[in-house]
């Protein structure tokens, strides 16, 4: 479920040495499955362990995960990185905002997952996003742009060279193309 690098494990052991005996760490997700999802790590004293917690044993400590957060922490990783600017703990949880879907899930769910987990994070740097409206019987993913993408002069390039290429590569034989149904209104909100 969660991978913790050797460097991060050593860091946690060092931090926990100053805590009361039996204290572990807790890894959690606030607002899991939403765009506002945030992950965190905290101390977990023995009296804060819940009966439905999942205990993940590591070298010298355990990581406690509440039942609600668990599916959103699949494939999560924690690392302790040191560079010339200092050290920092990093927590990456690719499924925090949206639960990973199985490979046999309906096509619309799998496409939506890719949009939320891979495409929208890229568009977010421009204040934009896309939403899946439907997948037609012909296999065309009908999309609607929002935020900074609405009215952007680069939207056709983003759609054809970026999004369509990525989706067709990921869903060969299932998707045949993409179509934009956005009523584009160029304004101050538009990226370009």
From Swiss-Prot:
<dbReference type="GO" id="GO:0051604">
    <property type="term" value="P:protein maturation"/>
</dbReference>
<dbReference type="GO" id="GO:0051539">
    <property type="term" value="F:4 iron, 4 sulfur cluster binding"/>
</dbReference>
<comment type="subunit">
    <text>Homodimer.</text>
</comment>
<dbReference type="Pfam" id="PF01106">
    <property type="entry name" value="NifU"/>
</dbReference>
<keyword id="KW-0408">Iron</keyword>
<feature type="binding site">
    <location>
        <position position="149"/>
    </location>
    <ligand>
        <name>[4Fe-4S] cluster</name>
    </ligand>
</feature>
<dbReference type="GO" id="GO:0005506">
    <property type="term" value="F:iron ion binding"/>
</dbReference>
<comment type="similarity">
    <text>Belongs to the NfuA family.</text>
</comment>
<dbReference type="InterPro" id="IPR035903">
    <property type="entry name" value="HesB-like_dom_sf"/>
</dbReference>
<dbReference type="GO" id="GO:0016226">
    <property type="term" value="P:iron-sulfur cluster assembly"/>
</dbReference>
<dbReference type="InterPro" id="IPR001075">
    <property type="entry name" value="NIF_FeS_clus_asmbl_NifU_C"/>
</dbReference>
<feature type="binding site">
    <location>
        <position position="152"/>
    </location>
    <ligand>
        <name>[4Fe-4S] cluster</name>
    </ligand>
</feature>
<comment type="function">
    <text>Involved in iron-sulfur cluster biogenesis. Binds a 4Fe-4S cluster, can transfer this cluster to apoproteins, and thereby intervenes in the maturation of Fe/S proteins. Could also act as a scaffold/chaperone for damaged Fe/S proteins.</text>
</comment>
<dbReference type="InterPro" id="IPR034904">
    <property type="entry name" value="FSCA_dom_sf"/>
</dbReference>
<keyword id="KW-0411">Iron-sulfur</keyword>
<protein>
    <recommendedName>
        <fullName>Fe/S biogenesis protein NfuA</fullName>
    </recommendedName>
</protein>
<keyword id="KW-0004">4Fe-4S</keyword>
<keyword id="KW-0479">Metal-binding</keyword>
<dbReference type="InterPro" id="IPR017726">
    <property type="entry name" value="Fe/S_biogenesis_protein_NfuA"/>
</dbReference>
<dbReference type="InterPro" id="IPR000361">
    <property type="entry name" value="FeS_biogenesis"/>
</dbReference>
<dbReference type="Pfam" id="PF01521">
    <property type="entry name" value="Fe-S_biosyn"/>
</dbReference>
